[in-house]
Amino acid sequence: MLRFNQKIFPKGAILMNHKNLLRILTATLLVAIFATVGLVYAKTAERTPEYALEKIIQAVNDKDGATLARYVDADALAAATYDEGTAILARDIEKLHALYPADWFFRHDTAFMTNYIAERRTDDLALISRTLDFYFHPSETPVTRVDGNAHWLANETRAFEDHYTAKLAGVEENGNTAIATIDITGDASDYGQLVPTLTVQAELTQQADGHYMLTRITNGEEIFYPIVKGIEDYWTLQGWQ
């Protein structure tokens, strides 16, 4: 059950191997956005971004896929987050290698990474989708190898549930869009200190009938490096690097 001001932000916990960095950067943010806006609102009008956030958290608590689909464009959110995150990854691959020389995954160049990402994009987005399926439907039994990976990632995500709190800092509206600012804070545990603080900005877009949908993260550039550091630190914490 999601609680006021508290839920997960899985950071690097769902890293299974270095190839998974591309998809993990996205899955981490998606689950964070779905799960961390667990805030209590006063009753609000239906056609407001605050109402949409309230319905999202209710849908997560109730495992209500139909309601979640009304207020979160999961495919658009996954694709946009993946594309921005992997574009930064390819662009900054040499910088990442300098920061983390022990990580063989960063020992490539931009051209290689661009091709690698293009080849993996469809499979990675499918894995992200299945990870979210298993996160919201924990009793589902994995069947395929991809299911097994996604199930493991979803379980690792849940392992972080008690280590992060989230607070809605504000909502700014501009025409038919709104930006929700969410401040995320880790506790004093090893997991909580993987990314001690992070501010995520999520865009909600008003639909034709007036209701708002969560569609993308707007500050991917800003949060990329703290998340990568969290992934690397998790890897070290587990003794795998």
Language model: regions and residue ranges:
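Short, surface-exposed, charged/polar-biased interaction segments
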Residues: 20, 77, 89, 98, ...
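Acidic, glycine-rich loop-and-strand cores that form catalytic or ligand-binding grooves
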Residues: 117-169
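Low-complexity, intrinsically disordered terminal/linker segments enriched in charged
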Residues: 149-241
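Short, low-complexity N-terminal intrinsically disordered segments enriched in polar/charged residues
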Residues: 26-119
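Surface-exposed polar/charged interaction patches
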Residues: 91, 99, 119, 134, ...
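Short, Lys/Arg-enriched N-terminal segments with co-localized hydrophobic residues
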Residues: 4-15
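N-terminal Sec-pathway targeting helices
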Residues: 15-30
